[in-house]
Amino acid sequence: MDEKLICLQLGALLHDIGKIIRRAGLDSKEHSKAGSNYLKNNNLLADRYKEIYDMIYYHHAKYLSSADLKEDSLAYIVYEADNIASGIDRVKYEDKQIRGNEMDSLNSIFNVIRIEKNNLKKTFKLFDFDKNGFNMPTSSSIKLNNSDYKKIINHIKDNLNTFKENINPEKLAIVLEACCSYFPSSSYVDTPDISYYDHVKLTAAISACFYLYDKENNIQNFKEEYFFTINRSKEKFLLVSGEFSGIQNFIYTI
């Protein structure tokens, strides 16, 4: 079991938790500070995975550039993974006062990908943890509020306290999928149709790929690799696809 890899994946999954804190009205600081402070103040993950605090606090360039971190800090990996998962260069946005409405609901992707006759704009309501339900987008105007996000952060905190030493990325991902799949990751984009969960899950996957590649190739200076001299032409990823057509007849006999 690679404890550093587990810590990295947990940190990547939680790197944007400050957005939920802000939207819940619990802290007005920038989300990187709000998230790190929340975990510290509630003594969450402090025993084994305290480095997660740095991954949350320093995942944007303006704080990371002046951070007193070791060259092998996992915060550098999360920083670059977050940039790639976002599909943008975060540096262009960090020093600008670009703010959307943090209470906007998640847009349906079919608001953009649609047939000619479909001009309805649909959004999702916040899912209420009903395991037997299915959350369909609606054309009704939906605005989320502080209490919606308070329920979410309390659900996450309760689970983190329950897991304690037995936490792992898979358990945390299940919790986040249940409560974070139906509100947007970013509030400053034109079309908020990427969910919070999808963004942090992708950030964690990219972080894990970086770490495993670097471990195999004996790369230990993450500060140089992911902050000072970023080289995105390195082939660190392998996308695997499979073809399962033709097995329907077998499936129907089960």
What are these regions (language model features)?
Residues 141-249:
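Low-complexity, highly charged intrinsically disordered N-terminal segments
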